[in-house]
Amino acid sequence: MTRHHQDRFLTTHVGSLPRSQTVVDQIFSLERGEPVDEAIFDQVMAEAVDEVVRRQVVAGIDIVSDGEMSKISYATYIKDRYTGFDGDSPRRTPADLLEYPGFMNRASSGGGTPTYRRPCCVGPIAVKDERPLHNDIKRVKDAAKKHGAKQVFMNAASPGVVSLFQPNQHYANDDAYLEALAHALRHEYHAIVDAGLILQIDSPDLGLGRHMMYKDLEDDVYLSRIEKHVEALNFALVAIPADRVRMHVCWGNYEGPHHKDVPLATILPTVLKAKPQGLLFETSNPRHAHEWETFAEMKSDIPEDKILIPGVLDSTTNFIEHPRLVAQRIQKFAEIVGKD
């Protein structure tokens, strides 16, 4: 999946990066259905991707991305690319925030919650418009070539995370919905890999789903559901080499109590069944920083070909971690599976 380096660990991130107000204005105009000049939109996005790739290269990031500049959200962007999605759906409140309503109200009133639509699945899912995907691919490849980035990844939603944020109102049951999503998303996955990019599957449904979509289920029922999510993903990836894919699992990138997060030990056996060779996961926030121990305890269960990509910086704090702390976090995992 990635180059191995003799002298140091390669660096990357999980995708979404800050956007300029100009980019935000263009994206939300499109989201609201307002007239958008296609040429201006393309120019704004191309310039934004060029700049964000340049900054990643300057910062020393080895495996860069387009920062998801053109996407309204890492999961709901599919409504612009596939048929079958329309309307809006009620927001599901995470279980941890339900127990702290005062905090939840402050967070929502302070502008910390998204205002974009989360449509429902209301009809058959099929490819509607390939242009946004191919435009994204072209922009990031052009920027990578210009600035000398050697490796590039591109994000794509997993079938499970689409089902998490866009409820099914069309298919007979959740299994049928996942199957339809896997068939449709396979097209996007192949296009990204065929373009020479590393495919990153965003699958927070495996973690976040526990205290959001499946918060009322018993653990065994929840685990059986995410097993289905992994099966759907593996079906979509059946013809793609594992070493061209990595998967991002998290418990929700928001500042909150997170005391309802499912322990990594509970989901790791299921997560490790997913085909992607690379596994990106949280390991630097107060709720999950201790879970390097889980990998140590389950070392024998980690497939030999898996590449662990721990998140050694926390994106929900304003603290700038000391380099020695970051080094310690890396060392803990290197001691478990080796630096290679």
Please provide the spans of the model-predicted regions:
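Domain-level signal for soluble alpha/beta catalytic cores
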Residues: M1-D340
